[in-house]
Swiss-Prot record:
This is Ribosome maturation factor RimM. Gene3D superfamilies: PRC-barrel domain, RimM. It comes from the Bacteria. The keyword tRNA processing does not apply. GO terms for biological process: maturation of SSU-rRNA. Belongs to the RimM family. Keywords: Chaperone, Cytoplasm, Ribosome biogenesis, rRNA processing. It comes from Bacillus subtilis (strain 168). The PRC barrel domain binds ribosomal protein uS19. GO terms for molecular function: ribosome binding.
């Protein structure tokens, strides 16, 4: 059986001379995912097999996550990692508490009002701060931005790929 991989980030550049790389994170739980000692897999152009690396250090710098790997600790050793996609296998995703979901479970879900009217599909999740914001693609209309808060999101069924929301006034531009 083929292994299922999930993107958790992309290396966009190097940082300094001590082998750190700048990562744009695409993971729901960055602090957990990039914890020192964790194993990540780098998928690079021109290579058939992923490169396995172990996180040595992790810190935030501006909008980037800076990672250093135990296997590569200087600028020359990480230069070739630019543009690598960072992934983890499905079995490393871990269990979530009730009411918690991975981004890949939410993206692609159809969003309905409590009255059953289809609004659109979740196409992206933004993480600006206090709560996540779901970007809902709508046919022939501007994308809708829905905050992931209890007063708006009423029911999520990831198996059926359906989400029900309470459509508050002004939440969606027609």
């Amino acid at each position: 059986m083929t292994k299922r991989w999930f993107n958790v980030g992309k290396i966009v550049n190097t940082h300094g001379i001590k082998g750190e790389v700048r990562v744009i994170s695409k993971t729901d739980f960055a602090e957990e995912r990039y914890k020192p000692g964790n194993t990540l897999y780098l998928f690079m152009d021109g290579r058939n097999e992923p490169v396995e690396v172990t996180v040595n250090t992790h810190r935030l710098h501006k909008q980037f996550h800076l990672l250093q790997f135990k296997e590569r600790q200087n600028l020359n050793e990480v230069e070739e990692l630019k543009n690598a996609i960072i992934k983890v296998p499905e079995e490393e995703l871990g269990e979530l508490n009730e009411g918690e979901f991975y981004f890949h479970e939410i993206i692609g879900c159809e969003v309905f009002t409590e009255e059953g009217e289809l609004i659109g599909k979740v196409k992206e999740i933004l993480t600006p701060g206090a709560n996540d914001v779901w970007v809902i693609g709508r046919k022939g209309k501007k994308d809708a931005l829905i905050p992931y808060i209890e007063s708006v999101v009423k029911h999520i069924d990831v198996r059926e790929k359906k989400i029900e929301i309470e459509l508050m006034e002004g939440l969606i531009d027609e």
